[in-house]
Amino acid sequence: MSIIEMRDVVKKYDNGTTALRGVSVSVQPGEFAYIVGPSGAGKSTFIRSLYREVKIDKGSLSVAGFNLVKIKKKDVPLLRRSVGVVFQDYKLLPKKTVYENIAYAMEVIGENRRNIKRRVMEVLDLVGLKHKVRSFPNELSGGEQQRIAIARAIVNNPKVLIADEPTGNLDPDNSWEIMNLLERINLQGTTILMATHNSQIVNTLRHRVIAIENGRVVRDESKGEYGYDD
């Protein structure tokens, strides 16, 4: 059974822009897929629809067992336990420590303190930053901040991880570190969808490639190439 099932999805914005034009995509549990395409093609809308940041206008969409067309507002937090999100600009809370940033994702769903401490230290170990547990975001490099953002995104053991340009603000060395981390997370069974403009990553670490242009899926290939000029 697909963990993401999108059928004939249409999204129009109030300014008249049609961002998605009849998009259909099926993703199986444990897949790693890149979302590629030129700027303004609809990638962001596609990604944001998967965690209900954007509500679609037509079609059907289910993610991790949730029907995103019929989902009630009160159930959106439940969806977001099953779908972790990593952003290009990290979105860490500047006045909270590394520990507090990650723990917050568990506190909001009512986890007890013992489980929070155990799990936060587990994910910090996974991302290689246990020694930064008491640091604040402004004391970290960009690569370290993104690793903490990934730790926060996976702390609740989501079935799906959405990564929106996760290497976009990073130098090549840090970009490869982030990709190696995402590969390890994927090998543990987490489904990953990653929007990117980085041709070198896509062409080197081969996975499924879903290309979007003008709001439509124009290419969907197993172990595909990037296919655009940077």
Curated annotation (Swiss-Prot):
Keywords assigned by UniProt, alphabetized: ATP-binding, Cell cycle, Cell division, Cell membrane, Membrane, Nucleotide-binding, Transport
Which Pfam families does the record match to this protein?
Answer: ABC_tran
A GO term for molecular function: ATP binding
Top-level lineage group: Bacteria
Q: Among its keywords, does the record have Transport?
A: yes
Q: Which Gene3D superfamilies does the record associate with it?
A: P-loop containing nucleotide triphosphate hydrolases (3.40.50.300)
The UniProt record gives the binding positions of ATP as G37, P38, S39, G40, A41, G42, K43, S44
**SMART domains membership:** AAA
| Mode of membrane association | Peripheral membrane protein
* Reactions catalysed according to its record: ATP + H2O = ADP + phosphate + H(+)
* InterPro entries in the record: AAA+_ATPase, ABC_transporter-like_ATP-bd, ABC_transporter-like_CS, ABC_transpr_LolD-like, Cell_div_FtsE, P-loop_NTPase
State the compartments where it is located.
Cell membrane
Q: What Gene Ontology cellular component terms go with this record?
A: plasma membrane
Q: What happens when the gene is disrupted?
A: Depletion causes reduced growth and failure of cells to separate after division, forming chains.
Per the record, the similarity remark reads:
Belongs to the ABC transporter superfamily.
* Subunit and interaction comment: Homodimer. Forms a membrane-associated complex with FtsX.
Q: Which PANTHER family match?
A: CELL DIVISION ATP-BINDING PROTEIN FTSE, IMPORT ATP-BINDING PROTEIN
The function of this protein is: Part of the ABC transporter FtsEX involved in cellular division. Has ATPase activity. Essential for cell division and viability.
Q: What's the protein name?
A: Cell division ATP-binding protein FtsE
Recorded name of the encoding gene: ftsE
